[in-house]
Amino acid sequence: MDSIVSLKGMGKVFHTKNGDVKALDNINLDINRGEIFGIIGLSGAGKSTLVRCINYLEIPTEGDVFFEGKGLKGMSELQIRRVRRDMGMIFQQFNLLSQRNILDNVCFPLEISGVPKPKARQRAKELLNLVGLSDREKAYPAQLSGGQKQRVAIARAVATNPKLLLCDEATSALDPNTTKQILDLIKDINKKMGITVIVITHEMKVIESICDRVAIIENSKIAEVGKVEDIFADPQSEIGKKLILGDVMERKEIVSGVKLRIEFDGRSSFEPVLSNMILSCDIPVNILYAQTKDIGGSAYGHMIIQISGEEEDQKAKRYLDSIKMSYHELDFSDNDNEKISLEKRKED
């Protein structure tokens, strides 16, 4: 694949009066041209520092950032500014100019780039139409809702036709309905304009909604990288499992039996797998946990079931093998007490 951004051994250390703080540690990532790439992690994991290193608002202390194959480390400040022209960025806090109406806000980066005013205004009008605000061009930021402000910020960020759009927690201050609208807009811009998008977030729902691939970051390091559907179906890292299954722990007494984690792969999520297994094998099944998600039009998810009895366990496994369902046997034992620790996702 053609990489537009490559991070090679990138690290970032902040020097404080209380000592050095390593914000990023040996980050290696390739972001492909034209994709929507997500970077997710808990607060303090290093997500925002990572995105600020990509456009060199923060200078890495180790490794380097490569944009279209060219390393930024050896560039002059003028050369870096030229590279930044190909990178748009939107933030959680919109950062609009309060004394300018929204048309002039979108014109601002064009003016800085030396675009003649008539051409800049024409381009700004086109973008306001694209983001659904053509009727509000004379309004000021204070007169807009949060979602409308973010639409203006997006229009401004892509005004100079950047090749890359960086989104740093762009929807975390918005309500769920407005968040969906903004994510749909970002996805639409990605398709229509061919802009590569990097999405920084702490919300798995954002990743599921629009991203092609995702990197999970924890404690300043990359925990795992892959296609969204693959990581959702079978997360390998502990932080991946926590982000996908949730963070509310519930402990349940389990008398006995095997616990199986069934993985739905898009093909099978809409099939009555469990019902068919119970009818076919004539075995009782206890559902301990279940969750499915729609990712890119296909359903993915997990189900954790308990089966009592060795014979029943073998019947279930043979059935799952026969229909080519992916599953894993889980061990949730805790010392001498057989218990299960289930992580349940918070539902809005």
Regions found by a protein language model. Name each.
Residues N55:
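Helix-to-loop junction immediately C-terminal to a conserved catalytic motif
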Residues G63-G71:
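Conserved ABC transporter NBD signature motif
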Residues V225-G226, D234:
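ABC ATPase "signature
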